[in-house]
Amino acid sequence: MAKKSLIQREKKRQKLEQKYHLIRRSSKKEISKVRSLSDKWEIYGKLQSPPRNSAPTRLHRRCFSTGRPRANYRDFGLSGHILREMVHACLLPGATRSSW
């Protein structure tokens, strides 16, 4: 189980990303429209002004049950070992174990 502080930190990052999403998107559109290099550098400065944790690359997917940030399956929202346990216990409908 992940520490609760790490899970809360991730939630805070998600809120920040949603808050500054429109600002980042509008700045990137402006950069593509502007031709002069000096204006582009000015807009790049604006793009760096939001907090670093508001960048979408800082977000991690976490397992719903354990909060683990690695080996997550997008379809289920679970980490690999929890997914395997749930499939073996027949708790996920439609998921079958592979055998060959």
Swiss-Prot record:
Keywords of this entry: Chloroplast, Plastid, Ribonucleoprotein, Ribosomal protein, RNA-binding, rRNA-binding
Record localization: Plastid, Chloroplast
Principal subcellular localization: plastid
UniProt keyword annotation of Repeat present: no
Gene Ontology molecular function: rRNA binding; structural constituent of ribosome
InterPro entries, per the entry: Ribosomal_uS14 (IPR001209), Ribosomal_uS14_bac/plastid (IPR023036), Ribosomal_uS14_CS (IPR018271)
Gene Ontology cellular-component terms listed: chloroplast; ribonucleoprotein complex; ribosome
Domain of life: Eukaryota
A Pfam short name: Ribosomal_S14
GO biological-process terms attached to the record: translation
Subunit composition and interactions: Part of the 30S ribosomal subunit.
Family statement drawn from the similarity comment of this UniProt entry: Belongs to the universal ribosomal protein uS14 family.
NCBIfam families per record: PRK08881.1
HAMAP family on file: Ribosomal_uS14_1
Known role: Binds 16S rRNA, required for the assembly of 30S particles.
Protein name: Small ribosomal subunit protein uS14c
Species this chain originates from: Lactuca sativa
